[in-house]
Design a protein with these regions (language model features):
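Positively charged n-region of N-terminal signal peptides that target proteins for export
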Residues: 1-5
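A short glycine-rich, aromatic-capped structural motif
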Residues: 28-110, 126-128, 251, 320
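Functional-site microenvironments in short loops/helix caps that host divalent-cation chemistry
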Residues: 45, 54, 58-72, 110, ...
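Short proline/glycine-enriched turn/loop segments at secondary-structure junctions
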Residues: 271-275, 301-308, 631-632, 679-680, ...
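Short, structured beta-strand segments at or near domain termini in extracellular proteins/domains
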Residues: 309-323
Length: 724
């Protein structure tokens, strides 16, 4: 058969049509009632070379990001010629609920919340289950069913086009449904009707009056309203098909492909099959309630194979897998290259000699970096010492905290080195709204890495490394969608505990082999205030330690002004006597922190507790009040990042010190490249904090950009007299 890249448009749901000369039919209906269309061989350009994503956040233009429909993610490059040598049949639509239930009768049968219709696309299906469905259907019919390769998917989506979408360089009116996340909608779009490509109800002029950018218009959808208006429906084939008769290639649900995710390579390829191995499987097409930039024909995404994210679906291909070539695994990033496996002999520094160093720049990212690490926002740090003496830090790197163009980056401060290495990619699923990663060393041979994602954006995974982070185990399912995890704690009796924001605590009593949920998520009607109790930690972004009497204590951040008033504008503290199942709420002596700030709480090896936080909320920085600190000539008021030490299990905190190198007033940079002044009385005013104590006795504290190292003796010592 002659190779070509274009065929005449067909009606997607047309009855069986036989070709002249006894050729295979263009459309078939299988035993499930599934319509499939024949895709002919051909050659096309896969990927997109530009234009690159701009630094909208750094340029103070974030509210314009939704207009960037043509800007690419780094993993779409280089664009390259691909030849598909064999025809295949592809599902005209995503697999529907009715079709999937012939494989699994129980699929969402008891899901009272979504109540999917039979012609809705089957959502929340893992890659593993999609493959299992294909194997079942293959056995049932005696024909090969499978997921499309990534190249087959993009080839079929484009249907001969070279534009951003198969409909041109934009989508038709109301093509992209939006009913999934009001918080993200108001983060991206100004008040009022959404752009014409989006399908969302319009607000009247009265509803829009007085609203500012980022404020909610019209309230949240209820499920009943959404289905009544068809805006919340996942019904297939409601939009015009592409030129080859395929529906919903842009939006509705994202669709699994067979490939392992990995970077593209340049040069022409024939029947590519992706990488030989990886951590993530590719998905394509984008999903509802996201910016249309993520629906482009070239856009790529990836997830762990066991992720049952509710915006994932799939469509099938009938035909043998192409006899293409698998690419080798991608080379390791800088943070995993040439990692020493020598365990050094580390002698602790004299405990009575004060030591301080910093701030040292941790986040080395080029000013114009737009992938795989980003210049705009580097946030939510985690740090651990490795057995070989290296410090390993990881964090979220993104153009904006709410954007799907989000990655995990990492850097090493190698043992004996003076500077952190340039940031490089860490474990990262593409087009997934990442949350704060967590790293922890068990003190022996094993590093733990807990992957975090935005609440309801997917499952969480756990990995291990026994070679100082040079390689990691395959990710294992840790828990279904939850909110952000915070720093892991190990108790005296070996219990591992991870506190979650406004959620429960995940607890392991067998060294991490199995985990149980203790407590539950906060409910909006509960009266959270000092003196009351509940099944969760008050506030969020909690930092937690075990007390000498076996209780757990957590300090948290708190944002809403009315809730802060209940705690007299002080940091909430919560206590649990039953391993996190119930909590008693109180307030500490320290000022409350809020948006863009996070505290840290550690049990030092010397025995005392260390608490690091900020004297003032970032939103109040212009009217800051500060705290009183000791100097060699008496008390003074300091502002910003501080450390405090307790010798009586958190009852009092007599030793405090502003975390600053002191000296003449000068500029430094913090979170989101925000400048601040540093001096004898001024310290870093805003950031998320995390810390670990290394074997030399030093506290390794990192902010969203910087690294400080100091010891207990330094915190206890009075600061030099501030210069006037």
């Amino acid at each position: 058969m002659k190779l070509h890249t274009l065929v005449l448009p067909l009606v997607a749901l047309a009855p069986f049509v036989a070709l002249r000369g006894g050729e295979a039919p263009k459309h078939v209906t299988n035993s499930l009632g599934m319509q499939l269309v024949r895709i002919e061989p051909g050659t096309f350009t896969m990927g997109q070379d530009g234009p690159p994503l701009e630094d909208y956040l750094g340029q103070k233009r974030f509210k314009e990001l939704y207009r960037a429909t043509d800007q690419i993610d780094f993993d779409e490059k280089p664009a390259h010629r691909v030849t598909i040598t064999r025809p295949f049949l592809m599902g005209v639509t995503e697999v529907t609920v009715a079709q999937y239930r012939q494989f699994d009768l129980t699929f969402k049968a008891s899901d009272a919340k979504s109540k999917p219709a039979e012609d809705d696309a089957a959502s929340g299906v893992t890659w593993l289950k999609a493959v299992e469905f294909c194997e079942w259907l293959s056995k049932k019919e005696g024909k090969t069913y499978r997921l499309p390769t990534e190249a087959e998917w993009e080839y079929a989506c484009r249907a001969g086009t070279t534009t951003l979408f198969n409909t041109g360089d934009t989508l038709p009116d109301a093509q992209q449904k939006w009913f999934g996340d009001e918080n993200l909608r108001v983060a991206y779009f100004p008040p009022g009707p959404m752009p014409q490509e989006y399908d969302w109800r319009k607000a009247g002029e009265k509803a829009m009056a007085g609203l500012k950018y980022g404020e909610l218009v019209g309230g949240s959808w209820t499920h009943e309203n959404a289905r009544h208006d068809a805006a919340g429906s996942l019904r297939v084939a409601q939009k015009t098909p592409n030129a080859w008769g395929l529906h919903d290639m842009h939006g509705n649900l994202a669709e699994w492909c067979s490939d392992w995710y990995g970077p593209y390579e340049s040069g022409a390829q024939t029947d590519p099959l992706g990488r030989v191995d990886g951590d993530f499987r590719v998905f394509r097409g984008g999903f509802h309630s996201s910016l249309i930039r993520f629906l482009r024909s070239a856009n790529r995404g990836s997830r762990v194979p066991y992720d049952a994210f509710d915006r994932m679906g799939f469509r099938v291909v009938q035909g043998e897998l192409p006899k293409g070539t698998l690419l080798p695994k991608a080379p390791p990033p800088l943070n995993a290259q040439n990692v020493s496996q020598t365990v050094p002999r580390i002698v602790p520094q004299p405990a009575n000699v004060p030591f301080f160093a910093g701030p040292k720049l941790l986040v080395h990212v080029a000013d114009d970096a737009v992938g795989p690490v980003y210049c705009s926002e580097n946030h939510c740090m985690t740090i651990t010492e490795c057995p070989n003496g290296d410090l390993l830090a990881a964090w979220v790197s993104t153009p904006a905290e709410t954007d799907l163009t989000c990655s995990h980056a990492a850097s090493r401060l190698r043992f004996g080195a003076k500077e952190w290495e340039p940031a490089s990619p860490f474990y990262d699923a593409a087009d997934v709204l990442d949350g704060a990663p967590q790293l922890w060393w068990d003190g022996d041979k094993t590093l733990y890495h807990l992957d975090n994602v935005y609440y309801k954006s997917g499952c969480q995974s756990l990995r291990h490394s026994t070679d100082n982070g040079a390689t990691w185990s395959k990710p294992e399912f840790f828990r279904a969608a939850g909110d952000y995890a915070n720093q892991l704690m190990r108790t005296k009796d070996g219990v591992l505990a991870i506190p979650y924001d406004l959620f429960e605590v995940m607890v392991s009593e067998d060294g991490g082999k199995s985990w149980q949920q203790h407590g539950r998520r906060m409910r909006g009607s509960e009266d959270v205030r000092p003196g009351n109790s509940g099944s969760f930690i008050a506030g969020y972004h909690p930092a937690m330690v075990e007390l000498a009497d076996g209780r757990w204590m957590a300090f948290s951040r708190l944002d809403p002004v009315p809730e802060q008033a209940r705690f007299e504008n002080r940091t909430p503290v919560s206590y649990s006597s039953d391993h996190g199942k119930t909590w008693q709420w109180d307030m500490s002596e320290f000022p409350v922190v809020s948006s863009a700030q996070k505290s840290v709480l550690l049990r030092l090896k010397e025995g005392p507790l260390l608490f690091c936080s900020f004297t003032d909320q970032w939103r109040d920085w212009r009217n800051r009040k500060g705290l009183v600190f000791k100097s060699t000539v008496g008390d003074y008021t300091g502002y910003g990042l501080f450390a405090a030490v307790s010798y009586d299990e958190g009852k009092t905190w007599p030793d405090r010190r502003l975390i600053t190198p002191g000296g003449a007033e000068r500029k430094w940079i913090t979170k989101e490249r925000t400048p601040f002044l540093i001096s004898d009385t001024l310290a870093e005013p805003v950031s998320y904090l995390t810390a670990t104590q290394s074997r030399d006795g030093n506290i390794q504290l990192v902010t969203s950009r910087n690294h400080y190292a100091f010891n207990l003796a330094w915190v206890k010592a009075p600061a030099p007299a501030p210069k006037k």
